[in-house]
Amino acid sequence: MAERTLLDQQAQGFFEELWQRGDHWEFDSSAFEQARYARLMALLAGRRYAHVLELGCGSGSFTQHLVGLAGHVVALDISPTAIARARAQWAGPATVDFRQANIMEYDLQAEGPWDLVVISDTMCYLGWLYSFFDVSWFASQIFAATRVGGYCLFANCMGEFGDMLMLPWLTRTYQSLLRNVGYHLEVEEIFRGTKYGVTIEVLISLFRKNSALDSNGAS
């Protein structure tokens, strides 16, 4: 328990320090990020999601896009500075609830089930900060908190550009966790673009939580 508490403190300290410096990842200003958001929204288009959970929302850059398809969004991030920035930048209706929380300690099912769960560029950091068992268990909790017929949108940068957290095989390991806990993979795409002067790929996966009948029929 003491070790887990220390991990939680280290996780918050890491992200809080980055956000206190500003938009480290250039989520608000990067053309690459805006193009990525557009692609993610295109995959989600055509449906209405009444109850949406975003895990690792940062300053709310993608959250602002989600609102157009959602009835209500709960957006979580571990950094108090990121959440303060998200709230300050949000000028829309009161359908978005930005909350400071450690998603690894958050009860995902308490307000569920969710029609859509979004986890973008988050699993790679969880895999670095926490044990593989902890991340695997977290994936199972995402699935359990999703409504039957609901969706999970997973996206993560990957490439051979020196960032060990985003090695392609590692990113696909996190994708496989979501498949193994019970989701059905409906769409997989690779989005490519340039950021920081290097070519980056994004593995995008749209999962659906089928009913037991659907799953048996699919097999």
Predicted features by range, described:
Residues L116-F132:
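A short SAM/SAH-binding and catalytic strip from SAM-dependent methyltransferases
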